[in-house]
Amino acid sequence: MASTDPVRIAQYGVSHAHASGHASVLSADPEVDFCGVYEPSVDARESAQRSSGYEGALWFDSADEMLGDDSIVAVAVEGHVHECLAMARECVDAGKHVWLDKPAGDVLEEFEEILDIARDKGLLVQLGYMFRYNEAFQRIFALA
């Protein structure tokens, strides 16, 4: 089997409750080149820069810098819920695949519009909704 280069993924936002955990997972995955983070809020960015979840992370100066990098193929959107759809829209408009945490945002129609744009551009949008720690799923895993 031929080896492939790691997938270059960036993170947009740090305000979601799971943001630093996802940054840690992306950084540790050998199949991912976690290439940086952009956070529009100076206060949130400075706080995140002091946390262990972002240790060693590159920080972009603007969304345009991150989204304009053609080597970045996907972006994990990790802002506040009310910000996520606008962030995701910027990402798909820039031709990036998107990973969104739950909930995707506040307005279903906006989410559906993003999905339509992504589909038209041949992009993937993945909504994270994991049950791996749910007791019922743990029992299923134990039986498998």
Model regions: which residues?
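N-terminal Rossmann-like dinucleotide-binding module
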Residues: 1-53
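Structural signature of beta-strand start/N-cap positions in the alpha/beta core
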Residues: 8, 33, 71-73, 97, ...
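Short hydrophobic "strand-cap" motifs at the C-terminus of beta-strands
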Residues: 12, 101, 128
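Short beta->alpha connector loops
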Residues: 15-18, 80-82, 105, 131-133
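Alpha-helical elements of Rossmann-like donor-binding domains used by nucleotide-donor carbohydrate transfer enzymes
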Residues: 21, 25, 47, 65, ...
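Alpha-helical structural signal in soluble globular domains
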Residues: 25-29, 48-52, 90-94, 110-117, ...
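Beta-loop-alpha module in the N-terminal Rossmann-like domain of NAD(P)-dependent dehydrogenases
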Residues: 57-117
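A contiguous active-site-proximal alpha/beta segment in oxidoreductase catalytic domains
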Residues: 105-144
